[in-house]
Design a protein with these regions (language model features):
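Short loop/turn motifs at secondary-structure junctions
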Residues: 53, 85-87, 152, 225-226, ...
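Canonical Radical SAM [4Fe-4S] cluster-binding loop centered on the CxxxCxxC motif
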Residues: 36-73, 96-97
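Active-site-proximal loop/turn and secondary-structure-junction residues that shape catalytic pockets
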Residues: 42-44, 48, 95-97, 138-142, ...
Length: 349
């Protein structure tokens, strides 16, 4: 049973034989993809406040220093993204920031919002008004909050990271696997197209990685909502001395993901963090959201690759590169799916 699973009534039964089979998977056991995809986005860090203090994370600021973007600043970034040809507005913030940070709560109240969820809803409406599709990563939220946010989001996400209880999640407020699995389940119950994934190298074992992938698979088999799984390596930063996983470790982890997950779920690696070219033949078929105008605020020391670099990665692998929306085709109405769109007729004078 996963840590804190009983607290959230998580009933996921993973057979030891399934874990053993997955641990036997090697990169040579999986196939290369038919294509590579990516989404062009703007990264909007709604607030840098978070109730957690995970030791590998540089995203959060301590109380008194955390920022909250204004509606005007959000609109400015969104408009710039539209001009740059982006289709996705990626909204991020830490778990329940208005719970721990008095300043953030006070500012939201002054602007007329009862909670960060209310404010996220309004921010997503700004993106929609300007022509971008929101994808929100709001941390652990309730099923009712998913129900409300689905109205204004094309897709959403939260990283499972691991089903293990690792020291990297230590602190006065500890992130638990049961809590994360509950969030992924809540999204499924509300039919929210969802992104999740593993963070490799934070103290978990190979058994934990296999178990985590199988837990994601089981939740997807119940609800059909997982559109992609990210296999992300931890990177060194000012708060962490974790060693970056080796290429061989990442190749094996990606291959295990491809073998564990149904074909319709994409396996993604972040091209600014991972040795992407070395991972494609292990089953990677998506390069995630890449921004031509904003930083990766979660990993600010690692710049996004330019579109030309993505094309080079695809060319070196002998694969076509296609831009996608933040929500995958199978969750869209049939008339607007990528392969089914009829070109507009030429204008008539």
């Amino acid at each position: 049973m996963f840590p804190a699973a009983d607290d959230y009534d998580i009933n996921i039964d993973i057979e030891a034989s399934a874990v053993d089979s997955l641990l036997d998977v090697a990169p040579s056991d999986v196939s290369s993809p038919a294509e590579l995809t990516f989404s062009r986005n703007v990264f909007i860090p709604l607030t840098t406040a978070c109730r957690y203090t995970c030791s590998y994370c540089t995203y959060y600021d301590v109380p008194g220093e955390a920022t909250l973007m204004s509606p005007e600043a959000i609109r400015d970034v969104v408009e710039t993204g539209v001009d740059a040809g982006c289709t996705e507005a990626l909204f991020t913030f830490g778990d329940k920031p208005d719970d721990r940070y008095t300043k953030i709560h006070t500012q939201l109240d002054e602007w007329g919002y009862d909670s960060i969820i209310d404010y996220l809803h309004a921010a997503c409406e700004i993106a929609l008004d300007e022509g971008l599709l929101p994808h929100s990563n709001p941390g652990d939220i309730t099923q009712a909050e998913f129900r409300r946010l689905r109205e204004v989001n094309s897709s959403m996400g939260v990283m499972l990271e691991t089903t293990a209880d690792v020291d990297a999640h230590s602190g006065g407020r500890r992130k638990t696997p049961g809590q994360r699995l509950n969030t992924i389940r809540a999204a499924g119950r509300e039919g929210v197209p969802f992104t999740t994934g593993l963070l490799v190298g934070i103290g978990e074992t190979w058994f934990d990685r296999a178990e985590s992938l199988l837990a994601i698979r089981e939740l997807h088999e119940r609800y059909g909502h997982v559109q992609e799984v990210i296999i992300q390596n931890v990177v060194p930063n000012e708060r962490s001395d974790f060693d970056q996983p080796s290429v061989d470790t990442m190749r094996r982890a990606v291959a295990m993901a491809r073998a564990a997950l149904p074909e319709e779920i994409s396996v993604q690696v972040p091209p600014n963090l991972s040795p992407t070219g070395d991972l494609i033949d292990c089953g990677v078929d998506d390069l995630g959201g890449v921004s031509p105008i904003t930083d990766d605020y979660i990993n600010p020391d690692y710049a996004w690759p330019a579109l030309d670099e993505l094309n080079s990665i695809a060319d070196d692998a002998g694969l076509p590169l296609h831009e996608r929306l933040p929500v995958y085709d199978r969750y869209l109405p049939e008339p607007v799916r990528r392969g089914d769109v009829t070109p507009a007729a030429d204008p008539v004078d």
